[in-house]
Design a protein with these regions (language model features):
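Hydrophobic h-region of N-terminal signal peptides that target proteins for export
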Residues: 4-14
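Short secondary-structure transition/capping segments
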Residues: 129-133, 151, 171-172, 205-207
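Extracellular/periplasmic catalytic domains that process cell-envelope and extracellular macromolecules
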Residues: 52-55, 73-78, 110-113, 151-153, ...
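Hydrophobic faces of well-ordered beta-strands that scaffold small-molecule active sites
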Residues: 59-61, 80-84, 117-121, 158-160, ...
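Glycan-recognition patch characteristic of GH18 chitinases/ENGases
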Residues: 15-148
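Structural recognition of alpha->loop->beta junctions
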Residues: 75-85, 135-163, 207-225
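Substrate-binding surface in catalytic domains of secreted glycosidases
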Residues: 91-101, 144, 165-294
Length: 294
């Protein structure tokens, strides 16, 4: 059974490809959460006794820090977990910015609605990830810092979003997740540990089978098959009809995880791109970068 996921709110193999998450993180890097008024409003809400019997799957959402003011109005009846995006790591495992995570009422609020809360930790880029993953002390520094953030906030777990992992760090990534899992399970009762993983493993950097066994779930980023800089317009998450599409990705994960279906989380997008194009034909050539629309 493939878990479904609600995502916040080719093609891929190109020199100017950038992660959608990285683009948003850079776009909003100067954004400051003004939580006081939002949290005070949320405290006036009465907790809802959610009935999870109607949910046939685990349903996970992401709350980006730049959309923090939306959290009191989310429909928590449709969620079982929510990840706060994000705590940004340095190459050496320090926390660059956690966006006031430990002081956010959102954590207590979501938990009062019966929803588990995880912190999403991010680091993007081959050089940065090589520096972090190849060094024991950097790995331990990151793990200790993330564990402190989760414990001090009373959250339920961690979600690791490392993107553009180089092939040279395949084994070190598994080692990092083993070390992280050990530390979290040693400190917390039944922590939830998940990872964001790519739609296509272009460089053979991901040991899906080992990572699925270590974690509670691999969140398959099933989007950005066509991206902002694509030479042709197309769907960001085509179900089928292309060589690389959702069907290909799911089958690839099933094959490489030895059918660990209880560990696969399919991430689906709530966005698309609006490109300037040559004509109105399907998959027309683009004449510039696309703008994300939700």
């Amino acid at each position: 059974m493939i878990f479904s996921l609600l995502l916040f709110i080719s093609h891929i193999l190109s020199q100017d490809w950038q992660s959608f998450h990285y683009q948003d993180q850079k776009r909003f890097e100067a954004f400051q959460i003004n939580s006081l008024n939002i949290d005070e409003r949320a405290k006036t809400f009465n907790p809802i006794n959610n009935n999870r019997n109607n949910l046939s799957h685990e349903v996970i959402g992401y709350l980006p820090y730049w959309e923090y003011d939306e959290y009191p109005d989310l429909n928590y009846n449709l969620l079982t977990q929510i990840n706060f995006f994000s705590a940004e790591l340095s190459d050496y495992g320090d926390i660059i910015n956690n966006h006031n995570w430990e002081n956010l009422y959102f954590i207590e609020f979501a938990q009062s609605q019966g929803v588990k809360v995880k912190l999403c930790a991010t680091l993007f880029g081959q050089e940065s990830l090589t520096t972090l993953l190849s060094n024991y002390f950097n790995r331990q520094n990151a793990i200790n810092n993330l564990l402190d953030l989760v414990v001090n906030a009373g959250a339920d777990g961690i979600d690791i979003d490392f993107e553009l992992v180089p092939a040279s760090q395949r084994e070190n990534l598994v080692l990092f997740m083993q070390e992280l899992s050990f530390a979290f399970h040693n400190e917390l009762d039944d922590p939830i540990i998940t990872m964001a993983t790519p739609a296509i493993d272009w460089s053979n950097a991901w040991d899906y089978e080992s990572l699925a066994a270590i974690t509670d779930g691999l969140f398959i980023m099933g989007y950005n098959y066509f991206y902002s800089g694509s030479s042709n317009a197309g769907p960001v998450a085509p179900l089928g009809g292309y060589f690389y599409d959702i069907e290909y990705t799911v089958n690839d994960y099933l094959d490489k995880t030895n059918n660990q279906t209880d560990k696969l989380v399919l991430g689906l997008p709530y966005y698309g791109y609006d490109w300037p194009v040559v004509n109105d034909l399907i998959n027309s050539e683009t004449t510039g970068y696309g703008t994300a629309r939700t």
